[in-house]
Swiss-Prot record:
Keywords: Cell membrane, Ion transport, Membrane, Transmembrane, Transmembrane helix, Transport, Vacuole. Residues 14-37 have a biased composition (Low complexity). Residues 1-43 are annotated as: Disordered. It is found in: Cell membrane; Vacuole membrane. GO terms for cellular component: plasma membrane; vacuolar membrane. This is Acetate permease A. High affinity monocarboxylate transporter (MCT) involved in acetate uptake. Unlike other activities involved in acetate utilization, acpA is dispensable for growth on the acetate precursor ethanol.
Length: 298
């Protein structure tokens, strides 16, 4: 076999050809470990595609991955005792956000978001909060902060909308006899979450496109919804076009969350394909790929 054919075979199968015979006393290489003289990051950038591209190996450092809710380089967690909690938290966030965003967009002429209360307490709230706590157990600070916070958001959202016991909306409308104070308060509530989401967004700038888009869409949704409640229409109601725009970006955020969740769940053991996540050119993986291209073109 010629050198050119051998090089093509290496690119197709995702690694260099094995040596004819190993030394009797040589230690066995870890599965997926880079060959001698090649860093783990360069190995992943050159051969990190195909059915095993998202399978965690025993590399010391892994690249950013939204399926693990990791915006930066992180240590391999192959030997952890916990399963990956990120897809659970992402799915809880996605479903609750999807339903509320459809209502905000006026789907099926639904005008009251009361159905979201059950989801916000049970799935988007409690389950996502638990996923955030489990992210603490696996050592993911970003995932723990984000998932726990958005779980708290949904619980707080459900408390605001719950009639009766909490009496929040009634107390805010009792003073002037209209809902202006409640709408202003709720708008400030949403703007606070816009600020928090912007902080989280900054932490995804070196991660993947799919992970970044999740927080970008969510950030725009909070901003537009907050503006819609503060800058109301002539009738004193939340501005319908702005609320619908916020619902649209919320819908995009929900699908982006499901996409990242699927990327974290699908692997060679349960799927015939792997979800692409597209690393930014300035991310660690993107830089390694660019350096490889520059070396090959010299």
């Amino acid at each position: 076999m010629s050198a050119e054919q051998n090089h093509g075979l290496e690119k197709d199968v995702g690694g260099p050809a094995a040596p004819a015979a190993a030394a009797p006393n040589a230690p066995a290489a870890a599965p997926g470990a880079p060959p001698a003289g090649m860093s783990a990051e360069e190995h992943r950038s050159r051969f990190g595609y195909g059915p095993l591209s998202h399978v965690n190996t025993k590399e010391a450092i892994l690249p950013p991955f939204g399926g693990e809710f990791q915006p930066g380089l992180y240590k391999s967690v192959e030997a952890r005792k916990f399963a990956n909690p990120a897809p659970l938290g992402l799915s809880a966030f996605a479903l609750t956000t999807f339903v509320l965003s459809c209502i905000n967009m006026g789907a099926r002429d639904i005008t009251h978001p009361n159905i979201v209360i059950a989801l916000a307490f049970g799935y988007g709230g409690l389950v996502q909060l638990l996923a955030g706590m489990w992210e603490m157990a696996v050592g993911n600070t970003f995932g723990a902060t984000a998932l726990s916070s958005y779980g708290g958001f949904w619980i707080a959202f459900a408390i605001v909308l719950t009639p009766g016991g909490f009496n929040i909306q009634t107390a805010l409308t009792a003073e002037n006899g209209d809902e202006a104070m409640f709408y202003n308060s709720f708008g400030l509530f949403l703007m606070g979450w816009f600020i928090f989401t912007t902080i989280m967004l900054f932490c995804t700038l070196r991660s993947t496109v799919a992970f970044f888009l999740l927080f970008l869409f969510l950030d725009l949704a909070f901003l537009l919804l907050g503006v819609g409640y503060i800058q109301r229409d002539d009738a004193g109601q939340p501005n319908p076009p702005v609320i619908k725009a916020g619902g649209f970006f919320g819908l995009l955020a929900a699908f982006a969350a499901w996409y990242n969740a699927l990327a974290g769940i699908a692997d060679s053991s349960n799927s015939f394909f792997i979800i692409p996540v597209a690393h930014f050119p300035w991310s660690p993986t993107g830089r390694a790929r660019r350096e490889k291209t520059e070396r090959e073109t010299v």
